Amino acid sequence: MHLNIKNNQIDLKYDDKDTTMIVPLQGTEDITVLFGKSPYFSSDVAPMNIRDIKITCDGDLIRHWKLWKHNGEVCLDEVKGARAMASYPSWLIDDHIEWRKIYAEKTSGRLDVAFNARDALFYLVRQDKVDILNGISGNMDKITVEKGYPVMEYTDHLVYDTLTNQLFSYSLHEKLVSFLSVDERTWSLSERHLDEPRYYNHARTFNSSDSSFYFFGGYGFYQYRNDLYRLKVGTKQIEGVTYSPAISPRYSSAAAIVGDELYLFGGRGNRQGKQEFNAHFYYELCAINLKTGKSRCVWKKRQSTDILMMASSMYFEPSDSSFYAVSMKDGGSLWKVFMNDSVWVEVSKPIHNDLVYQDCDFSFYSSPAHRKLYLVMDKILSDRTHDVAIYSINTPLLNDNEIMQVADKSLTPVWLWWLCGIVLLGGAFFFIYRIKCGKNRAISEDIKSSDTPIETFHFSESVEE
């Protein structure tokens, strides 16, 4: 946009289209530029992305608002520190520190959710159909299941395999698998199974080196579990994996594979594996070597008050040997858990999904191709209805200091420095004046309080002519 005050002309170029408007500009002292909704003429406006607002005068750059880092609704320009105010903004940079809800649903029917990491697609599997949610655009497709059944109709027992492009419904206690071909719209299992799961809230992860899914622990029928299972892609059988020494039974721990080892963090349970005994959180990181079958405690934290009810998976960050995991603390919060030290830190703002639930599918997913992390919270309430919410957060992750805009000290106006100097100088004079007044008052009081008589002398002056 170019303002020609001399010729009363505004030239606007938008989307490679030029527009010229004749407006009385001579004598104008202030100009307000609004991007988005106009408070004077329109009530609705389509959302738009804005960045890099620049103002030039006679070819010189006098203002530049990047609209990236900010302080609440205020953004400072890079030239003079001038303020730009946004009304009800949605800052894209905040998507790197805050979870954004991309889907919500309440339903009374049975539901399970799986994720396709390659295409960022969610599969919401119901009894006779599958809804496919695009995690990027938010678009929804539907397919009708023509025949067959999943092996488990409860939450937390569904995965998507990107190698075969199939949905896997699995039952750990029955060691059965049913495959859904999206193209053929058919489950491979011909008989319906209605058994309740024995392994609610188990940890799960995928091992690319042997193309297998691994599942650990869980809860069901008043017992905590510590069994380890494997499902190799392309087979229809789940097999148990032996290891020793045994890890204490638990549920709601997070799992990831690094090299030959399966790592487990957090969870809740007890050594006996029975609900009648007191349960507690496990503030520890354990590992199972999948080649040797040997388990170990990597580290254990003695005291903590954090809630270590974790999403079923976590993801390894090799740059600093840490894991990204999600805790139920504060209704959902992303943590960085360090492999070589008993430390975890919060790296996102909490979601605060504090709805009370009876059961929950709490699943954490990563889509590296789209540079996004996703979280599924499927809360089953006491009336057995589902309250489903799906959240996303962008990577790389940022912290508050990286999105907060700090005013450049070099941009402070000169008059402000003069004003500060005058205030300081005036304060110094006032301070000295008070000290002198204090001394004079003290001398006067000393004279008045003395008992020595005061003599008065009279002088007569004469002037000789």
PLM region spans:
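Beta-propeller blade signature
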Residues: 177-183, 226-236, 277-293, 332-343, ...
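Repeated scaffold domains used in trafficking and secretory/extracellular systems
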Residues: 105-115, 150-160, 197-205, 248-256, ...
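Extracellular glycan-interaction surfaces
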Residues: 1-24
